[in-house]
């Protein structure tokens, strides 16, 4: 339960899970990095515009060069908080987190071109949708590795 709580606090803000785990330097570092990347990417404005339905304006308001750092920072902070709180003991349990980071990063890159049924989901909602294939791919690859891989695998 403690590990799941840390994930949810890390979803709220990268670094909060580490603070709850009493890893203050690491937590404050994640918060600082989140603030820098968020500010330099102009991400809060893109979030606001996306929720207001101004998806095309959100697409042009962000700095993709900075925002592409965000998914890896975000999902690594979640994994770290989860692991340090006692989760992630099973072999390859990091894979869903890692594949979420990969899929969300790719989703961010293709967001300007991702149009379904005339709807542009933009730089906020399309990458969020990409979490689903990230989790599924991570779980699938974990299952394959556990089934056919080395029995001495470690997390």
Question: Residue ranges of each PLM-predicted region?
Answer:
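Transmembrane helix recognition focused on a "late"/terminal membrane span
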Residues: 1-6, 34-155
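Short hydrophobic alpha-helical segments that form membrane-spanning helices or hydrophobic packing faces
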Residues: 27-34
């Amino acid at each position: 339960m403690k590990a799941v709580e840390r994930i949810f606090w890390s979803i709220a803000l990268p670094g909060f899970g580490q603070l709850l785990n009493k890893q203050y330097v690491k937590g404050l570092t994640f918060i600082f990095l989140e603030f820098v990347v968020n500010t330099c990417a102009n991400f809060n404005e893109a979030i606001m515009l996306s929720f207001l339905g101004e998806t095309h304006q959100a697409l042009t308001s962000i700095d993709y060069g900075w925002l592409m750092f965000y998914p890896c920072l975000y999902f690594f902070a979640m994994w770290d908080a989860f692991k340090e709180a006692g989760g992630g003991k099973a072999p390859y349990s990091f894979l869903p987190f890692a594949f979420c980071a990969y899929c969300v990063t790719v989703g961010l890159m293709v967001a300007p071109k991702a149009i379904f049924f005339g709807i542009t989901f933009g730089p906020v909602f399309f990458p969020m949708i990409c979490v689903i294939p990230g989790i599924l791919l991570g779980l699938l690859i974990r299952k394959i590795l556990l089934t056919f891989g080395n029995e001495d695998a470690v997390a």
